[in-house]
């Protein structure tokens, strides 16, 4: 993050490798924030950073082991760092850092390393024996778990996808499990079943391993909650405090009903200049469209640009009434449309480093219908 650098000296472009161009971004008007607001951003940013390993693990069962082994080789390498194999390993490691794993962040295809397997094996054997050895094929065999999200026709898309949301279950078993939950659950205001859990088969039984403070990913979530608690000392208003408390309760219980309550109150909080997203949100990384990848963003309002945007959102009903669609598809009453322009202060998880340029949440259809949504454009990334 770069802040307060003149237009004539600021260079948006950073390093380039393979098909990736890294870009820098500024934090305009950050100096105009109060010390208290900056402290709030700091605590929320720390909470964002501690979700990184969750995303790595979600994106592939072996991602964390591969990353940590690569990092150990990189740090302990004593040979010629200009040599082809080491340079190729360095580029591969950058791919892994960027994509939160060994699969392309957009295409979801497995990366093909350009360093030799013999080179890598020798370097692993030359360093600390406490490092976990990799199994054959996890890096070098393109046929082993070749795609993070595989929706190819005719395949069991759960078993053919390398993402780490399911353990030992088939596509049919996933469909049956969640169909039963939906059938037995409420017809109105239903939770987003499966959003925060790994579905696991043990023997003949199938259960959810819920992502919460005393469940899976508990070590990382405990640190996230620690910094959320620290952030409470610097909130801008009582509603922000309420929102943070609700998020903490959700992380402690893993109860999706609590997540919906949090989402509604997060949506209602409009007065503070600082806002954030922290949790299991988007389901694009799951071939079944159920499991939320962890993501985080800390933001503050771009006041001038928000003023312009809100002039449009205030007239949302007029735009709906005059939209060029069949009248039967127009909403008679437009609810809860808010539009802000924000500056991203910190990105994490599935939002980093390939970030969205805009966000519209919550995702639950019934919340959007009854309570509306928050729509933001990220001005310092566009």
Residue ranges and their predicted role:
Residues 63-70, 86-96, 221-228, 244-252:
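Short amphipathic alpha-helical coiled-coil/interface segments
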Residues 81, 85-205:
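Auxiliary tRNA-acceptor-end handling modules of aminoacyl-tRNA synthetases
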Residues 5-9, 14-40, 151-382:
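Fold-level signature of zinc-dependent metallopeptidase catalytic domains
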Residues 2-85:
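Zn2+-dependent metallopeptidase catalytic domains
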């Amino acid at each position: 993050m770069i802040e307060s650098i003149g237009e004539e000296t600021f260079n948006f472009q950073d390093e380039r490798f393979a098909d990736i161009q890294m870009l820098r971004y500024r934090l305009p008007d950050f100096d105009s924030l109060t010390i208290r607001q900056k402290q709030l951003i700091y605590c929320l940013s720390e909470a964002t950073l501690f979700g990184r390993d969750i995303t790595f693990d979600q994106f592939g069962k072996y991602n964390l082991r591969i990353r940590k082994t690569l990092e150990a080789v990189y740090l302990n390498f004593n040979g010629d760092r200009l040599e082809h194999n080491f340079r190729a390993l360095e580029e591969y490691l950058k791919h892994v850092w960027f994509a939160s794993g060994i699969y392309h962040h957009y295409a979801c295809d497995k990366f093909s390393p350009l360093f030799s397997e013999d080179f890598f094996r020798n370097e692993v054997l030359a360093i600390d024996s406490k490092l976990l050895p990799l199994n054959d094929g996890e890096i070098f065999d393109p046929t082993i778990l070749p795609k993070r999200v595989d929706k190819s026709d005719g395949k069991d898309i759960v078993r053919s996808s390398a993402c780490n949301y399911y353990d030992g279950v088939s596509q049919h078993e996933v469909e049956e499990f969640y169909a039963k939950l939906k059938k037995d659950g409420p017809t109105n205001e239903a939770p987003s079943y499966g959003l925060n859990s790994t579905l696991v088969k043990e023997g003949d039984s199938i259960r959810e391993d819920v992502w919460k403070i005393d469940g899976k990913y508990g070590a990382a979530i405990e640190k996230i909650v620690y910094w959320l608690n620290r952030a409470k000392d610097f909130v801008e208003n009582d509603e922000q405090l309420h929102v943070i408390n609700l998020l903490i309760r959700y992380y402690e219980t893993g109860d999706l009903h609590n997540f919906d309550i949090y989402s509604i109150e997060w949506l209602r909080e409009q007065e503070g200049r600082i806002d954030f997203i922290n949790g299991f949100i988007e389901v694009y990384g799951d071939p079944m469209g159920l499991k939320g990848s962890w993501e985080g963003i800390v933001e503050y309002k771009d006041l001038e640009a928000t003023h312009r945007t809100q002039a449009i959102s205030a007239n949302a009903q007029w735009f709906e009434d005059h939209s060029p669609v069949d009248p039967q598809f127009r909403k008679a009453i437009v609810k809860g449309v808010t539009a802000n322009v924000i500056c991203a202060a910190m990105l994490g998880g599935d939002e980093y480093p390939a970030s969205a340029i805009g966000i519209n949440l919550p995702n639950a259809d019934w919340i959007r219908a009854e309570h509306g949504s928050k729509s933001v454009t990220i001005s310092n990334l566009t």
